[in-house]
């Protein structure tokens, strides 16, 4: 059992980080193994700007090796924030770069150093995740201070794959790193679909079945499908009990399995659109932000997509 949430500010910019943290705290009872968020359009100013989060070994010269690796693929480092969090011999570092090349090449360059592992890469998505509680997570990264257009979040109770930062949600697609997903449930035909995607050149970074969803949807969108069409395709192919929320730079999509075995509640107000595993997350936002939601539970096999107004 995990808790998932997606929020969108109807005017295109607002306290999305605070919305996510407040919602996730209301869902904390659904999982305490890890927590993560993706906040969109949080204010990158340079063209081709990327925010890279890495776990760097806390040893002399490690960050220098990472910097050299980034330069080797023509990445231009603009800022490094070291030691956002220190744990078990690793430093959680944030690196802002300007980069026009392949995200996969950048990922491989950093991983090849042997002293760092990539946690996330984003252009318009700012992704943070860690193995901790919502309250401690917010204390480390100050997520509640982030402004943005929309975002998704997750609290995890692990049932199958490992418990570490790399198995924490949100998951992203390396070819399309600003497509991210949070998921509650199980994908029972995971290995079959994974094999099919790998034959098409899709690379998986974990054995978490949730990662399959983002790759599947991103692949379908790369072939010309809209987010809504890709989600409808996905729920007809994915098997098992599931509900998920997926985000792109301009949209949030929500979907649940054909039997409706994992609940999702959506709420529409003049200021916020929200989807969450439980109504209590919506109630917190109503109370704290004076939102008046029109609520409904997602029907079996239903897909809903919200798009930013530009």
Model-predicted regions and their roles:
Residues 1-310:
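Conserved short alpha-helical segments that host acidic/polar catalytic motifs at enzyme active sites
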């Amino acid at each position: 059992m995990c808790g998932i949430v997606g929020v969108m500010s109807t005017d295109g910019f607002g306290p999305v980080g605070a919305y996510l943290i407040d919602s996730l705290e209301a869902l904390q009872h659904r999982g305490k193994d890890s927590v993560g968020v993706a906040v969109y359009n949080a204010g990158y100013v340079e063209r081709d700007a990327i925010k890279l989060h890495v776990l760097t070994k806390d040893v002399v010269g490690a960050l220098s090796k990472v910097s050299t690796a980034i330069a080797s693929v023509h990445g231009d480092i603009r800022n490094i924030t070291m030691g956002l969090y220190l744990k078990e011999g690793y430093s959680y570092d944030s690196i802002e770069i300007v980069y026009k090349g392949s995200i996969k090449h950048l990922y491989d360059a950093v991983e090849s150093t042997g002293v760092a592992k990539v946690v996330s890469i984003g252009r318009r998505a700012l992704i943070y995740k860690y193995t901790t509680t919502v309250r401690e997570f917010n204390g480390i990264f100050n997520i509640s201070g982030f402004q943005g257009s929309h975002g998704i979040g997750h609290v995890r109770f692990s049932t199958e794959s490992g418990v570490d930062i790399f198995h924490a949600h949100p998951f992203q697609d390396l070819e399309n790193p600003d497509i991210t997903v949070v998921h509650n449930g199980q994908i029972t035909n995971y290995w079959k679909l994974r094999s099919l995607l790998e034959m098409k050149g899709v690379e998986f970074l974990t054995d978490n079945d949730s990662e399959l969803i983002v790759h599947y949807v991103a692949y379908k969108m790369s072939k010309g499908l809209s987010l809504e069409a890709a989600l409808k395709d996905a729920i007809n192919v994915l098997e098992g009990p599931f509900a998920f929320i997926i985000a792109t730079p301009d949209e949030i999509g929500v979907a649940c399995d054909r039997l409706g075995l994992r609940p999702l509640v959506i709420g529409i107000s003049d200021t916020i659109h929200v989807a969450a595993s439980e109504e209590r997350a919506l109630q917190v936002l109503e109370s704290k932000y004076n939102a008046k939601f029109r609520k409904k539970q997602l029907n079996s096999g239903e897909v809903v997509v919200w798009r930013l107004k530009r």
